[in-house]
Amino acid sequence: MNGLLRIRQRYQGLAQSDKKLADYLLLQPDTARHLSSQQLANEAGVSQSSVVKFAQKLGYKGFPALKLALSEALASQPESPSVPIHNQIRGDDPLRLVGEKLIKENTAAMYATLNVNSEEKLHECVTMLRSARRIILTGIGASGLVAQNFAWKLMKIGFNAAAVRDMHALLATVQASSPDDLLLAISYTGVRRELNLAADEMLRVGGKVLAITGFTPNALQQRASHCLYTIAEEQATNSASISACHAQGMLTDLLFIALIQQDLELAPERIRHSEALVKKLV
């Protein structure tokens, strides 16, 4: 049996230390076959004895036999290579491994996003939201879904907020805005012409722009009164924006909780009342 296929088939039943080895071998088989057992142990973060035992659990006499199996597996792959489909996720990964890679990627994106935004900057953005007469939230595609979700939460705690995802309606809305209004634009790339045009118009009428966008300098950053940054590992060709959406969602949830903390007298009661109203529909 193909050595890589054998690892994939047994992956779900492996112990945690064995999964570390399996992850490394599945991700970098070409590198692994040139390593000694000690070198592989160091790379995977396990003991040398774990490497030998892992090879034996797979049915090989030892690590040299496993390396030979990896070489044979790689040699047989030219006609049907393992296709990368999203960052470290490959087309032939078991679903359990896909899930673990997604969790690792999304968690890393959320931690990186939290670390790049200072406490002071977060409080400044909370103040902007609390001071706004009306909050217009927008985004395109997946970012628009994050904007919609945040708008619903803001309304639950008494804010005059609305998500506008139709770009023609967005432009009509911002041109009729007042200096007390706030545009919250969510865009990982910050390059979409529609959003930047809306930001320009909001600034023209005297309003403010809060951007949730990527850390790489972009046009939306240049227009924003304040920025919160998202850090995510996204490929230029990837349209799913998986980790970016998790980072955006974490930031908006953080702002939501901060707003509740600053209105403990009324916000929790408003949430309960909103939930009670919804229950009447059932």
From Swiss-Prot:
<dbReference type="InterPro" id="IPR035472">
    <property type="entry name" value="RpiR-like_SIS"/>
</dbReference>
<dbReference type="GO" id="GO:1901135">
    <property type="term" value="P:carbohydrate derivative metabolic process"/>
</dbReference>
<keyword id="KW-0805">Transcription regulation</keyword>
<feature type="domain" description="SIS">
    <location>
        <begin position="125"/>
        <end position="265"/>
    </location>
</feature>
<dbReference type="Pfam" id="PF01380">
    <property type="entry name" value="SIS"/>
</dbReference>
<dbReference type="InterPro" id="IPR046348">
    <property type="entry name" value="SIS_dom_sf"/>
</dbReference>
<dbReference type="GO" id="GO:0097367">
    <property type="term" value="F:carbohydrate derivative binding"/>
</dbReference>
<feature type="domain" description="HTH rpiR-type">
    <location>
        <begin position="1"/>
        <end position="77"/>
    </location>
</feature>
<keyword id="KW-0238">DNA-binding</keyword>
<dbReference type="GO" id="GO:0003677">
    <property type="term" value="F:DNA binding"/>
</dbReference>
<protein>
    <recommendedName>
        <fullName>Uncharacterized HTH-type transcriptional regulator YfhH</fullName>
    </recommendedName>
</protein>
<dbReference type="Pfam" id="PF01418">
    <property type="entry name" value="HTH_6"/>
</dbReference>
<feature type="DNA-binding region" description="H-T-H motif">
    <location>
        <begin position="37"/>
        <end position="56"/>
    </location>
</feature>
<dbReference type="GO" id="GO:0006355">
    <property type="term" value="P:regulation of DNA-templated transcription"/>
</dbReference>
<dbReference type="InterPro" id="IPR009057">
    <property type="entry name" value="Homeodomain-like_sf"/>
</dbReference>
<dbReference type="InterPro" id="IPR000281">
    <property type="entry name" value="HTH_RpiR"/>
</dbReference>
<dbReference type="InterPro" id="IPR036388">
    <property type="entry name" value="WH-like_DNA-bd_sf"/>
</dbReference>
<dbReference type="InterPro" id="IPR047640">
    <property type="entry name" value="RpiR-like"/>
</dbReference>
<dbReference type="GO" id="GO:0003700">
    <property type="term" value="F:DNA-binding transcription factor activity"/>
</dbReference>
<keyword id="KW-0804">Transcription</keyword>
<dbReference type="InterPro" id="IPR001347">
    <property type="entry name" value="SIS_dom"/>
</dbReference>
